[in-house]
């Protein structure tokens, strides 16, 4: 399932993130690339020891914690601390690749299984040319280029790339989510049921049938979720 979520960051949060990123120093994006990805990755990344990293991560995670659509679509069990990357000049693209299934936490203690990948755009699309996130999966090929502050989520098993940025600068935040529901088809069914329940409540209220169907949703989640 591919899903876009608008306005994950408020205007104030986006301005704060932009200010922090403007003060940041960047390093080669190869620091987090696996063996396959290293052959096609050509961008820059904010290093772990960046003075701005903690504030930026706190800002993004705080926004995700209050976003109901992000929760129902990903059902997060663990969220890998977000990373930040930049595409511009000669470091301007990332060829087709698949994200590693297991991601080591930045502190080196433990792993996160990458079930869902997410990109939070931090540059407005009018400010750069190229830089589309192209994703191939069972839903076909999708090209994504969103307004700053908006996010796309998609299965981490998807083959994807960032096309060359030929003018301007593309800055984004990316992260990996381990879901309580590992199977993407089960996760999609739960999302669709939750959205249908939301629409039913708006249309007809908390009827007996809606309450019963809500119980079915939670029983399915109880059956499929990992503790």
Curated annotation (Swiss-Prot):
One GO term of the biological process aspect: intracellular iron ion homeostasis
GO molecular function: 2-oxoglutarate-dependent dioxygenase activity; iron ion binding; L-ascorbic acid binding
Residues annotated as binding Fe cation: 97, 99, 160
Its EC number(s): 1.14.11.-
Entry-linked InterPro entries: Oxoglu/Fe-dep_dioxygenase_dom, PKHD_C, PKHD_hydroxylase, Pro_4_hyd_alph, Pro_4_hyd_alph_FE2OG_OXY
SMART domains reported for this sequence: P4Hc (SM00702)
Gene3D superfamilies xrefs: q2cbj1_9rhob like domain, Rabenosyn, Rab binding domain
Protein name: PKHD-type hydroxylase Neut_0373
Source organism: Nitrosomonas eutropha (strain DSM 101675 / C91 / Nm57)
């Amino acid at each position: 399932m591919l899903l876009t979520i608008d306005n994950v960051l408020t205007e104030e949060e986006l301005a704060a993130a932009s200010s922090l990123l403007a003060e940041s120093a960047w390093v080669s994006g190869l620091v987090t690339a696996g063996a396959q990805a290293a052959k096609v990755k050509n961008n820059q990344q904010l290093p772990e020891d960046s003075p701005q990293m903690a504030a930026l991560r706190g800002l993004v995670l705080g926004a995700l914690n209050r976003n109901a659509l992000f929760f129902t679509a990903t059902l997060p069990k663990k969220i890998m601390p977000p990373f930040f990357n930049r595409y511009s000049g000669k470091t301007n693209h990332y060829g087709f690749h698949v994200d590693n299934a297991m991601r080591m936490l930045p502190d080196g203690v433990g792993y996160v299984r990458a079930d869902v990948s997410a990109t939070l755009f931090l540059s407005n699309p009018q400010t750069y040319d190229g830089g589309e996130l192209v994703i191939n999966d069972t839903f076909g090929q999708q090209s994504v280029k969103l307004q700053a502050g908006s996010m796309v989520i998609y299965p981490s098993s998807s083959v994807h790339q960032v096309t060359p940025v030929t003018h301007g600068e593309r800055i984004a935040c990316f992260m990996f989510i381990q879901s309580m529901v590992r199977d993407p088809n089960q996760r999609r069914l739960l999302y669709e049921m939750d959205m249908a329940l939301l629409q039913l409540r708006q249309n007809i209220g908390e009827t007996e049938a809606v309450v019963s169907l809500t119980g079915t949703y939670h029983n399915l989640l109880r059956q499929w979720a990992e503790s």
